Amino acid sequence: MSRTLSHTTARLGLAAGLLLAAIGVRAATRVAAAPQAVTLDGILHADNDDTLAFTPDGDTVFFDRSEGKRKTIMVAQRRHGHWMPPQVAAFSGTWFDQDPLVAPDGSYLLFNSDRPVRPGGQPLVQDYFVGGRAPGSNIWRVNREGRGWGKPVWLGPVINNDVFVDFASVAADGTLYFIRFDAKARVMHTWRARYRDGAYLPPQRAGLGDPDVSTHDPAVAPDESFIVFDYGKVKGGLGRLCIAFREGAHWGWPIDLGDAVNRDLPWGAHLAPDGRSVYVTGNAGIGRLSLAPWLRPPAAAPAR
């Protein structure tokens, strides 16, 4: 999602309490530290960069950069332990592009764009929640080709069936999570589409929390054992970073990650390569949040 209007820290305590009561999340029962600031050797701009997405080896990062009314996806490489200055990604630079996401195996990348679906067409526009016309969004895919990346391909009408389909997250088996505005409920919902035989099945609502409450920016674990997302964000309002765990065929109730985590109004969660932390963007910039207080310790290797 794009950067939202800032809210003063002085209002956060009261507003957060009211929001928790209103949206019915489970209050935090474990203490989590605030996200740790991330600058990547100073190449990131705290005021206009967000949504870090790393390749599995951690040596390449994609993110989006805001410049006025434009958003562009940037890419940077780590060489000899140091991050090089970012460049505009080969598939970006013309349209309103944002929210890159690298698949768990690194074989492809997804991103959002308002670019025309067909050559020569008009860019997508929407008026759902900004009080007027704003860039629309569909999800596009770029495959890894050798040491580079291919051409963007529209993800198709099964997924992109609206002018605002946004913020993809992918499980290891290709199952896709994304957000789309529910015009009937007047809230943003997270949707889930399974991937079978090279195609997406029709998406269904993921079932995160109360259907009358907006969800944004999902970051799902490769095995779908947990999902981190923004819960309760409405027009002009606050959202809270939450986690939910898989319970059979359904998701458990959202668990609020606590005031220390939510003090900076984080959004845009992306799972880190370690699978046990997320990168988020807040009013102060980009941070890395350990999920260790919420996750079980990794299984020990069998004794030999």
Language model regions located:
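Residue-level marker of positions within ordered structural domains that often coincide
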Residues: 3, 22, 105
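Bacterial N-terminal signal peptides
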Residues: 13-22
